[in-house]
Design a protein with these regions (language model features):
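Polar-ligand-bearing catalytic/cofactor-coordination segments
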Residues: 1-110, 124-125, 129-181
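Small-residue-enriched core segments of transmembrane alpha-helices in multipass membrane transport
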Residues: 110-122
């Protein structure tokens, strides 16, 4: 029954998969997971044995629907592009600042090894500045995947129980501090 329901879910999402597979996780962790893995014609659904053993079929279905939401919305590509742009922007700003610092005579040249700690300081500060933006974008993507899961399955109670159980089982912080978030 599980295999048929998960295959039907992937078909409704217009996502071709090679099949549904179980992954042995219980010998290494108590965490549970279900995922869409692979690219193109190698794409497949993988469900951890820890999830198969402890979750209802409805709960597994909504977890996979969430993962399919990421696929349908091309979230991996969006994250790769956005993180690359942030990194390039950060390196560009660091380059401008390093050139200004060298021009001011604080360092002999850009190739001076003494500029390396300053460069690391700049990248650390830049990371702290963009982290809230990056985290906000990640949260948006997660909310959209949640919404997709709910719209594609209409199983609100199963979604709530699965997400609560996953958070507890995987030791996630259910309500993180606004500073962390």
């Amino acid at each position: 029954e599980l295999t048929q329901r998960l295959l039907a879910l992937t078909q409704r999402a217009n996502t071709k998969v090679r099949g549904i597979y179980s992954m042995q996780m219980s010998n290494k962790t108590t965490a549970a997971n279900a995922a869409l893995m692979g690219l193109g014609n190698t794409r497949r659904v993988v469900v951890g044995d820890t999830m198969i053993d402890r979750y209802t079929v409805d709960e597994i279905e909504v977890v996979l629907a969430h993962e399919l939401g990421h696929h349908v919305h091309s979230d991996i590509w969006k994250l790769i592009i956005s993180q690359s742009l942030l990194m390039l922007g950060g390196l560009y700003v660091a380059n401008l600042i390093l050139h200004a610092v060298v021009a001011a005579g604080l360092y002999r040249s850009l190739t001076d090894a003494a500029t390396l700690p300053f460069f690391f300081l700049l990248t650390g500060v830049f990371s702290l500045i963009v982290m809230p933006i990056s985290n906000s974008y990640s949260r948006l993507i997660e909310y959209q995947a949640d919404e997709y899961a709910l719209q594609s399955t209409h199983k609100v109670e199963s979604f709530k129980s699965a997400m609560t159980r996953l958070a507890n089982q995987n030791l996630a912080e259910i309500e993180p501090s606004p500073v962390v978030e």
